[in-house]
A protein has these predicted regions:
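Short alpha-helical segments and helix-capping/turn motifs at coil-helix boundaries
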Residues: 1, 11, 29-31, 46, ...
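Start-transfer (signal-anchor) and selected internal transmembrane alpha helices
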Residues: 1-22
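Membrane-interface starts of transmembrane alpha-helices
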Residues: 4-8, 90, 94-102, 123-130
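Generic alpha-helical secondary structure signal
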Residues: 10, 75-86, 128, 132, ...
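Helical transmembrane-bundle signal
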Residues: 13-17, 113, 135
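Membrane-interface coil-to-helix junctions
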Residues: 17-110, 138-154
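Transmembrane alpha-helical segments
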Residues: 110-117, 156-160
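Transmembrane-helix signature of polytopic, membrane-embedded enzymes
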Residues: 114-136
């Protein structure tokens, strides 16, 4: 595989991820996919980024269910997603932007890791491109865009 073909595949997957996540991707600094779970998940990822540099051993001592201790353990800690979003959170302090960019990155990486896996199995870049597209952009990921931790699937193809 030439690096230019890999770059073209990644560019196509980024474009598809931006289209797939619209309208949040069109106004990423102040729009989330919904007012329910995405708001909570953006908060959790921002909390993780905040706490990782402030007091990493107290990561689970979130203020979300104050005064209960270790309240982040009441739900998903989202640490893998938070690590993807952390640089944006640290640089901008904008949880919505960080969450939206992490979602776009997750979809792009999901498609690309499946591309790499399928290419290794089939030896065909065209089939690998279609496999990556089908893996990341399907009815399941479309309905679960509200839950970044559910569509954070880029790790599975790497397991094989």
């Amino acid at each position: 595989m030439t690096s230019s073909r890999a770059a073209m595949a990644v560019a196509a997957y980024v474009l598809a991820a931006i289209v797939w996540t619209a309208p949040a991707s069109l106004s990423p600094t102040d729009t989330l996919p919904d007012v329910g779970d995405p708001v909570h998940l953006a908060y959790v990822m921002a909390w993780d980024a905040h706490q990782l540099v402030r007091a990493p051993l107290s990561l689970f001592d979130s203020n979300s269910f104050y005064p209960y201790p270790s309240s982040l353990a009441f739900g998903d800690h989202l640490l893998p997603e938070a690590l993807m979003a952390a640089p944006v959170n640290w640089l901008t302090g904008n949880a919505a932007l960080a969450s939206n960019l992490a979602l776009i990155a997750s979809l792009t990486l999901s498609a690309f890791t499946m591309f790499l896996f399928a290419r290794r199995i089939t030896g065909l870049e065209s089939a690998a491109f279609v496999a990556g597209f089908a893996y990341a952009f399907n009815s399941f990921t479309r309905t679960e865009l509200l839950r970044i931790h559910v569509v954070n699937l880029q790790w599975w193809p790497l397991a094989f």
